[in-house]
Amino acid sequence: MHSSSPFYISNGNKIFFYINLGGVMNMTISFLSEHIFIKLVILTISFDTLLGCLSAIKSRKFNSSFGIDGGIRKVAMIACIFFLSVVDILTKFNFLFMLPQDCINFLRLKHLGISEFFSILFILYESVSILKNMCLCGLPVPKRLKEKIAILLDAMTDEMNAKDEK
């Protein structure tokens, strides 16, 4: 048996097939540590959580159900990344065809797995949340960007009401 391989097949009279969870876990952790997009998801989630807590402290609006919902969403994002990284290890599917060539050239990508593709989507989502929390904390944000964030959030949530700020 090869402990470094996630699969073991016996070549005797019977063929045994099973997943060695330790091997899959080691490969997954190694995979996650090598991919910048996955590291960026964890970084943006952490930074957004910090800014969200600071925003709640500043506004004195601690809402445990809102915090729990946000925490569940962030844990689910990380769980999805772990799951999709296992899918990447097993399938080796390449999502580069979904990105414009300019982005591929700028990022110098040769391969984009499903976990990295969803990592990019999660990074974009968390980046909007970071900008929102920066505005709510009173940090300097360019006026045009702040207005666009307020309009976007007004259409999608009730967290930053753009009508109240005008």
UniProtKB/Swiss-Prot annotation:
Family: Belongs to the bacteriophage holin family.
Quaternary organization: Homomultimer.
Main location: membrane
GO cellular component: plasma membrane
Gene Ontology terms: biological process: protein transport
Cysteine disulfide partners in this protein: none
Mutant phenotype after disruption: Cells grow normally but accumulate a strongly reduced amount of toxins TcdA and TcdB in the medium.
Protein name per UniProt: Holin-like protein TcdE
Superkingdom of origin organism: Bacteria
Membrane topology category: Multi-pass membrane protein
Keyword presence, Magnesium: no
Protein localization: Cell membrane
UniProt keyword Plastid, yes or no: no
Organism name: Clostridioides difficile (Peptoclostridium difficile)
Keywords carried by this UniProt record: Cell membrane, Membrane, Protein transport, Transmembrane, Transmembrane helix, Transport
A Pfam entry, by short name: Phage_holin_4_1
UniProt-recorded Gene Ontology molecular function terms: pore-forming activity; toxin transmembrane transporter activity
Transmembrane segments: 15-35, 36-56, 77-97, 111-131
